[in-house]
A protein has these predicted regions:
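Catalytic Walker B motif of ABC-type/P-loop ATPase nucleotide-binding domains
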Residues: 147-151, 156
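Walker A (P-loop) phosphate-binding loop of ABC-type ATPase nucleotide-binding domains
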Residues: 32-37
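ABC transporter nucleotide-binding domain
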Residues: 165-181, 185-250
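Conserved ABC transporter NBD signature motif
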Residues: 54-65, 69-70
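C-terminal coupling/interaction segments
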Residues: 236-282
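ABC-family P-loop ATPase nucleotide-binding domains
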Residues: 72, 78-135
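Helix-to-loop junction immediately C-terminal to a conserved catalytic motif
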Residues: 46
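A short, flexible loop at the N-terminus of ABC-type nucleotide-binding domains that lies
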Residues: 1-19, 24-26, 67
Length: 282
């Protein structure tokens, strides 16, 4: 579905160099600190910027620029994109109907009712949650094979976030070949939705792992100086010096639970993954 092999994009003060593969039928999370390169990677995938080097393939199309037929198969929701604030949902409906031959008019209408999106109200009067729901709805309403979503639930309350996540689960359940690439700073959303996670830092992928593996096997060891000195560090990925001693990030917390019962072992989630992998040493 998406393949990037040594894809490079260089700017004056930043350079991106990525290799990743997102097969069909997967929901993949793309995480990292602000400025890590997520937005640049998305622009490359969408053909908004051209790579300086490397091989990029999206939906079978190789090269930076996407032909119209491929664009028809992609649904996009970006944080800084959207329709004119003077438009209404009815205006959006007519625009989508003209843009996409596969626009699902009845589906769009039904979901507007479910999501409580008024048809005649101008978008400038919409709440943040309503705008976010409309962005995602427009992305999934034309039978896209690939969804690319940049922070779709940012700044939303729990109810609005869950409505959007339910939309995405319904979308993926309708066709097992559909694929989603999603960025988010809300780790619980990713942990409940994604099959796997790519972590990007300073323009490079530094970790790729299945979400279940992260939640079931990763963890943080809290050790003092003496415990750290005698610790078997074979399964320690990163170490962070702290006031009391060390925090050690591991991809095999069960090993330490079984062999070092005196050590405090905490479960590692996506937040811990980002914090430890983009800091510490080793």
């Amino acid at each position: 579905m998406i393949t990037m092999q040594n894809v490079r994009k260089k700017y004056k003060d930043f350079e991106l160099e990525l290799s990743l593969e997102i097969p069909e039928g997967r929901i993949t999370g793309f995480v990292g600190k602000n400025g890590a390169g997520k937005s640049t990677a998305i622009k490359l995938i969408l053909g908004l910027v051209k790579p300086d080097a490397g091989k990029l393939c999206v939906l079978g199309n190789e090269g930076g620029e996407l032909p119209a037929a491929v664009k028809q198969k992609i649904g996009v929701s970006l944080t800084e994109s959207g329709f004119s604030s003077q438009f209404t949902v009815e205006d959006v409906w007519h625009i989508l109907a003209k843009m996409y031959p596969d626009f699902q008019k009845d589906f769009f209408d039904k979901k507007c009712d479910v999501l409580k999106l008024p048809r005649k109200k101008k978008l400038k009067e919409f709440s943040t949650g309503m705008k976010a729901k409309l962005r995602v709805l427009t992305a999934i309403s034309h039978k896209a094979d690939l969804l690319i979503l940049d922070e779709p639930t940012a700044g939303l309350d729990v109810e609005a976030r869950n409505e959007i996540l339910d939309l995405l689960r319904e979308y993926i359940a309708q066709d097992e070949k559909r694929t989603i690439l999603i960025t988010s700073h809300i780790s619980t959303d990713l942990e409940s939705l994604c099959d796997d996670i790519y972590l990007i830092h300073d323009g490079k992928i530094i970790l790729h792992e299945d979400t279940d593996v992260i939640l079931e096997q990763y963890g943080i060891l809290k050790v003092n100086e003496e415990q750290y000195r005698t610790l078997d560090k074979t399964a320690v990925i990163k170490v962070q010096k702290e006031t009391y001693g060390y925090a050690c990030f591991t991809n095999d917390r069960r090993f330490y639970q079984e062999n070092y019962p005196q050590i405090a072992v905490e479960q590692g989630g996506i937040d811990e993954l980002i914090l430890m992998m983009t800091g510490g040493y080793r």
